[in-house]
Curated annotation (Swiss-Prot):
Record's cofactor remark: With its partner (PsbF) binds heme. PSII binds additional chlorophylls, carotenoids and specific lipids.
Entry keyword annotation includes Chloroplast: yes
Broad class of the protein's primary localization: plastid
Protein name in the entry: Cytochrome b559 subunit alpha
Topological type in the membrane: Single-pass membrane protein
InterPro entries the record matches: PSII_cyt_b559_asu, PSII_cyt_b559_asu_sf, PSII_cyt_b559_CS, PSII_cyt_b559_N, PSII_cytb559_asu_lum
The protein's required cofactors: heme b
Family: Belongs to the PsbE/PsbF family.
GO cellular component: chloroplast thylakoid membrane; photosystem II reaction center
Binding site for heme: 23
Gene that specifies this protein: psbE
Record flagged with keyword Plastid: yes
Molecular functions per Gene Ontology: electron transfer activity; heme binding; iron ion binding
Membrane-spanning ranges: 21-35
Length: 83
């Protein structure tokens, strides 16, 4: 017979009231925090991705496609330059 590690069983944890009191607060809080992170636009700023209205500018309406293998840095500079 093997020894006990002293840890609570999974069934004992998920049937406890303390587990559900804690998780009934944290799970909705994480959902609301994620929704606010995306809906306020902070996710665009943190990760540096363009907002949906910034993909195409007035001066550049085409797809920014890199075609050259050896001059790719120059093409990237041209695409990232708004003027």
């Amino acid at each position: 017979m093997s020894g006990s590690t002293g840890e609570r069983s999974f069934a004992d944890i998920i049937t406890s009231i303390r587990y559900w009191v804690i998780h009934s607060i944290t799970i909705p809080s994480l959902f609301i925090a994620g929704w606010l992170f995306v809906s306020t636009g902070l996710a665009y700023d943190v990760f540096g991705s363009p907002r949906p209205n910034e993909y195409f500018t007035e001066s550049r309406q085409g797809i920014p496609l890199i075609t050259g293998r050896f001059d790719s840095l120059e093409q990237l500079d041209k695409f990232s330059n708004p003027f």
